[in-house]
């Protein structure tokens, strides 16, 4: 019986390198599946893992096959139904076996279902927020916001095969073999010198010569038994996440909770803010978040009240903007903080208040913030607030606005608002 002894120190997750390669190869299909899956989740279940399905034809492997040209003769099993030049009808409906569940039942045909596999929470969030960043982030005097980046950190004795250092492993192998065989090689060299002297001496010393030859053979066998490479020699490139200091930042979340916002609209707004919160907490450290709810009056609240409070009322959007301006002046000096804001509303506002919102943003907030995003969640025609904000968008580069009609628009809009920009930071 043959026994295999696994001496690897990293016995767990032995197929991790294959899994990572698979995720890289089919990233486009996986991201498409994730963008579709996120719309089906509840607000509280956004950050868990996910079952991802990929069409079978998208994961087909390259293969060699015969070309279509040329003259070929083949021998096929005989049958009593078809003769040469007969045409075989294509199966109808589901008979083709595509696995999609479409069409009618058939007694023949075959195919494969979509490939389904599970990704972890970390893999899910990495793909969810890939290529996203806070726009116009500038390094200020006080650095408390920390972004983690991967850096080389020497070598380690365990790791995945993809990170193995061939040169360092061979150097360790040479050093080990030299250390283990140095004494034997010196002894071998001395025996070979003695053998040469005895072989040339007169009279011949056959017994002594035979003994030396036997010892030399044993020493050479011992030296050859030292393995060329051992798990002890293996070295892997080590990577670690190091804090990369950046500028401190604050995000203002302004949510309309007026009576015109029905429950489904509020749920879509909450989904957007949950994505924003996960993105900030996943990508940056020590980002401060200020939550503001407003109807006719605005109030700064904590995270729990922001997402779960049932308070409602009329609509005066400027109350939230005024409160944000007060908080900025009181706690967040624009010279030391990167200030961001994300506002969500259904666009329904008191008509006389919309010009005031334009004035507050243009004169007080937009000159001091790095980026201000506005999303309007409605299926109705845009009203005065949207039109006032359109003037701001044409004037200020750090103002962006998007329209969300239904749940499927949330994630694409979020990526559009926070995709990485190559533009230089605002001074």
Swiss-Prot record:
It comes from Escherichia coli O9:H4 (strain HS). Belongs to the UPF0229 family. This is UPF0229 protein YeaH. InterPro entries: UPF0229. Residues 92-102 have a biased composition (Gly residues). HAMAP family: UPF0229 (MF_01232). It holds the Pfam family DUF444. Residues 79-110 are annotated as: Disordered. It comes from the Bacteria. Residues 79-90 have a biased composition (Basic and acidic residues).
């Amino acid at each position: 019986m043959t026994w295999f002894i696994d001496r690897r120190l990293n016995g767990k997750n032995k197929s991790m390198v294959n899994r990572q390669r698979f995720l890289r190869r089919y990233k486009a299909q996986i991201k498409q599946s994730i963008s579709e899956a996120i719309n089906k989740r509840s607000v509280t279940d956004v950050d868990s893992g996910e079952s991802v399905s990929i069409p079978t034809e998208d994961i087909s492997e390259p293969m060699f096959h015969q070309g279509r040209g040329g003259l070929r003769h083949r021998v096929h099993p005989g049958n009593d139904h078809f003769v040469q030049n007969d045409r075989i009808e294509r199966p109808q409906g589901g008979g083709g076996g595509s696995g999609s569940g479409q069409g009618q039942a058939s007694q023949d045909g075959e195919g494969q279902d979509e490939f389904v596999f599970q990704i972890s929470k970390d893999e899910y969030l990495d793909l969810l927020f890939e290529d996203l960043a806070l726009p116009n982030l500038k390094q200020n005097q006080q650095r408390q916001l920390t972004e983690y980046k991967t850096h080389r950190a020497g070598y380690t004795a365990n790791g995945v095969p993809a990170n193995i250092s061939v040169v360092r492993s061979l150097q360790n192998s040479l050093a080990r073999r030299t250390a283990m065989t140095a004494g034997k090689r010196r002894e071998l060299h001395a025996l070979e010198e003695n053998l040469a002297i005895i072989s040339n001496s007169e009279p011949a010393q056959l017994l002594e010569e035979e003994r030396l030859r036997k010892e030399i053979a044993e020493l050479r066998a011992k030296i050859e038994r030292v393995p060329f490479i051992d798990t002890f020699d293996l070295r892997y490139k080590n990577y670690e996440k190091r804090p990369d200091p950046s500028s401190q930042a604050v995000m203002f979340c302004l949510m309309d909770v007026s009576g015109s916002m029905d429950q489904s609209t509020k749920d879509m707004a909450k989904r957007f803010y949950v994505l924003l919160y996960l993105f900030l907490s996943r990508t940056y450290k020590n980002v401060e978040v200020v939550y503001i709810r407003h109807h006719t009056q605005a109030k700064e609240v904590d995270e729990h009240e922001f997402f779960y409070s049932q308070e409602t009322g009329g609509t005066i959007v400027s109350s939230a903007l005024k409160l944000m301006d007060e908080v900025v002046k009181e706690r967040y000096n624009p010279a030391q903080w990167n200030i961001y804001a994300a506002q969500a509303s259904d666009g329904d506002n008191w008509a006389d208040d919309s010009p005031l919102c334009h004035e507050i943003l243009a004169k007080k907030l937009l000159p001091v913030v790095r980026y201000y995003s506005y999303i309007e969640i409605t299926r109705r025609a845009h009203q005065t607030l949207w039109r006032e904000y359109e003037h701001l968008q044409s004037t200020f580069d750090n103002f962006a606005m998007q329209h969300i009609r239904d749940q499927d628009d949330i994630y694409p809009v979020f990526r559009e608002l926070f995709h990485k920009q190559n533009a230089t930071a605002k001074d």
